[in-house]
A protein has these predicted regions:
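Conserved catalytic cores of phosphodiester-cleaving nucleases, focusing on short active-site segments
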Residues: 22, 45, 65-81, 94
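A short acidic/basic microdomain associated with nuclease active sites
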Residues: 39-57
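Nucleic-acid nuclease catalytic cores
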Residues: 78-125, 129-130
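Solvent-exposed, charged helical/coil patches
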Residues: 1-44, 112-113, 118-133
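Accessory recognition modules or surfaces
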Residues: 2-9, 57-69
């Protein structure tokens, strides 16, 4: 599945989860429900899988993404009033560490909030996009 279709489908899953569960559960409930919805559609993500962080040739630590499709997409799930900026920065760092280009930050707050993040800046409607078309 192409990445834009994949992210669109996962966002649809998030809205379904929010419609059923509403707001107020802990993050893990939404993460588990999102994984179930994704699995139903044949989108099989790794959940809470440890990923090593390297500095040059040295292992310096690890992080644990909520859900991820290796080499395709990292999904971070939150259950807060609004998405804090530091969570956006953290997702971009995860993308950089894994060399994955795309990430979704999904907040199951009073309403669903979705932020799509990229490892590298991708301006919308740039001159290059216009020339390629």
């Amino acid at each position: 599945m192409e990445i834009n279709d994949l992210t669109h489908t996962i966002i649809g899953c998030a809205y379904k989860v929010h419609k059923v569960l509403g707001f107020g559960f802990i993050e893990k409930c939404y993460e588990n429900a999102l994984k179930i919805e994704m699995d139903k559609l044949g989108i099989h993500a790794l959940q809470q899988d440890k990923v090593n962080v390297w500095y040059e040739e040295h292992l310096v630590g690890f992080f644990v993404p909520d859900l991820w499709l290796p080499e395709k997409l990292i999904i971070e799930v939150k259950s807060v009033q609004n998405i804090p900026r530091e969570h956006e920065v953290m997702l971009v760092n995860y993308l950089t560490a894994t060399k994955i280009d795309d990430g979704l930050l999904i907040n199951f707050g009073p309403s669903v909030q979705v932020k799509r993040k990229f490892r590298e800046y991708k301006p919308k409607g740039s001159l290059i996009d216009a020339l390629v078309r």
